[in-house]
Design a protein with these regions (language model features):
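Short, surface-exposed alpha-helix to beta-strand junction/turn motifs within ectodomains of secreted
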Residues: 41-66
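Cleaved targeting-peptide boundary
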Residues: 19-28
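Extended, polar beta-sheet/loop recognition surfaces of beta-rich domains
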Residues: 27, 36, 40-47, 101-114
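N-terminal signal peptide c-region/cleavage motif recognized by signal peptidases
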Residues: 10, 15-17
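Exposed aromatic-hydrophobic patches
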Residues: 79-83
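A glycine-anchored, Pro-Gly-centered beta-turn/N-cap motif
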Residues: 86-95
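Sec-dependent signal peptide recognition
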Residues: 2-8
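Short beta-strand segments within Ig-like beta-sandwich modules, predominantly Fibronectin type-III
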Residues: 69-74
Length: 114
């Protein structure tokens, strides 16, 4: 018994920390939304992002990068600021890395209406 108690006391020190991945919780505009040209596109993640390893592209219906859409990382938010977008379908292709250093990728589309 004298040997078991010290060993049990050390168990919490051996367990690694529990990390969650940086999952996309929601976006503005939402996936499949039909909106007027947005002034910004905001992605809300489940944890703060590592700015050096996270980012996004805004693509038009032909898969071309829409220029002028800088990306800002602010904690769990990823914000794209495109210029005025003509009507059409757009796709946001994102990748995120949280504090656990695991990369997640995803995308969603929305439509800019006339």
């Amino acid at each position: 018994m004298k040997r078991i108690l010290p060993a049990l006391a050390l168990l919490p020190l051996l367990a690694g920390p529990a990390f969650a991945h940086s999952h996309l919780l929601k976006s503005e505009p939402a996936a499949n939304a039909k909106v007027r040209s947005p002034g910004h596109i905001t992605l809300h993640f489940s944890e703060s992002l590592e700015p050096a390893f996270s980012g996004a592209l805004l693509l038009d219906k032909d898969g071309r990068n829409v220029s002028g859409a800088p990306v800002k990382i602010d904690g769990p938010l990823m914000i794209l600021t495109p210029g005025p977008l003509p009507p059409g379908v757009y796709k946001v292709s994102w990748h995120s890395v949280g504090h656990d250093t695991h990369r997640l990728d995803g995308n969603f589309s929305f439509t800019v209406k006339p």
